[in-house]
A protein has these predicted regions:
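Flexible loop/turn connectors
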Residues: 273-325
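Bacterial signal peptide processing site
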Residues: 47-49
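Hydrophobic alpha-helical segments within soluble ligand-binding/sensing domains
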Residues: 143-185, 284-305
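Beta-alpha junction/loop-to-helix N-cap segments that form part of ligand/metal-binding clefts
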Residues: 89-151, 245-269
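C-terminal motif of bacterial Sec signal peptides marking the signal peptidase cleavage site
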Residues: 41-45
């Protein structure tokens, strides 16, 4: 019921009052509608604040300690920087280079914002799959070799950058000489199908020759012939050197079983291989280079950095490590400057 006190004697004031009441009613409805819209926008904003903004695909060639550590470092860095606003999808090729191609193509089809390629085969596949999506590599020894670039000077000029796992090969040659100065021959055991391994073989041979060693190469094509090639290397060498090689890392247990029986010590190119079959190594931290790769990804995704102009980054420091269990087999004692492999 509406009280009309003060308006009963005149129709005009009553009419004006009704008009005012209608206007007030419309204003209330508009205000209420505005409040509903504002509330809805606030709810949408709150709901989307934690939603995924970036989709990153990680292609890892194989599962072994070095590559696993690099992937974990990448994930840790990127999630620390972007939190819930990044979705990281990890796919493992289980050592199959062909699977790397399939993985890369799936990431391209999904329209990911960035691809992290862990190991050379993963990088080559990703680079072949897209020229537009930013690609960051890690666990790559030499990008010029991996991407078949001429006159490579540290910047690719295309949609690829990343971090290198190249350890100082001259320092590794010196480590071998410090531990085995009386050895005459060094056998280099590696996979001929890995370009980065071939690069390391060429480079370290120069340093080993400078110490007076006779250098012999023993290459296998895949895991199927690791055992017989390792046996031959042990029979014909005083010491074996294994570069950073994914196939060797996958087959470290097989190599170790043969080398221990033959009493042929192994110097490894990185701590993952040293953990499996080596006496000692001068190594980088794969977790650290993975972490650095994650920081590069953040700069690309969040700050718009141009991947084609980002220089390849290298490990800032190297660590001497040894394997106590294997060292005991050869009666070797290591000083405080060596850490134990984990």
């Amino acid at each position: 019921m509406i009280q009309m006190s003060g308006f009963a004697r005149s129709g005009k004031p009553l009419f004006q009052c009704l008009i005012k009441m209608k206007r007030v009613g419309k204003m209330k409805k508009l205000i209420a509608l505005s409040l509903v819209l504002i509330l809805a926008l606030l709810l949408v904003s709150c709901g989307s604040s934690g939603s995924t903004k970036y989709h990153v695909g990680v292609s890892q060639l194989a599962q072994h300690p070095a590559l696993d550590a690099a992937t974990q470092g990448f994930i840790d860095a990127l999630t620390e920087k972007l939190g819930d606003s990044v979705q990281i999808e990890v796919k493992n090729a289980s050592g199959d280079a062909g699977a790397c191609t399939t993985i890369a193509q799936s990431f391209v089809s999904d329209g990911v914002d960035l691809i992290m390629a862990n190991a050379t085969s993963a990088l080559s596949a990703a680079a072949s799959a897209t020229a537009d999506i930013p690609i960051l590599g890690t666990s790559i020894t030499e990008y010029g070799v991996a991407l078949d670039l001429e006159n490579f000077s540290g910047v690719t000029g295309r949609n690829v950058s990343g971090t290198s796992d190249l350890a100082p090969l001259d320092g590794q040659a010196q480590l071998l000489h410090d531990l085995f100065p009386d050895a005459k021959s060094v056998g280099i055991l590696y996979c001929s199908g890995e370009p980065n391994s071939r690069y390391q073989v060429t480079e370290i041979t120069v340093f080993l020759n400078a110490y007076g060693y006779e250098v012999k190469e023993f290459s296998f094509t895949d895991s199927n012939d690791v055992a017989p090639v390792t046996q031959q290397a042990c029979d014909e060498s005083d010491v074996i050197y294994i570069p950073t090689d994914n196939t060797a890392a996958d087959c470290a247990e097989t190599i170790n079983n043969i080398a221990l029986v033959a009493k042929t010590p192994i110097i490894a190119g990185e701590e993952g291989i040293c953990h499996g079959c080596g006496v000692a190594t001068l190594t980088i931290s794969y977790y650290d280079i993975g972490y650095a790769t994650g920081l590069m990804a953040y700069e690309i995704l969040a700050n718009g950095a141009d991947v084609s102009q980002m220089p390849i980054e290298y490990a800032p420091e190297f660590v001497k490590k040894y394997n106590p269990a294997i060292a005991d087999q050869y009666g070797l004692v290591f000083g405080e400057e060596f850490e134990t492999v984990e």
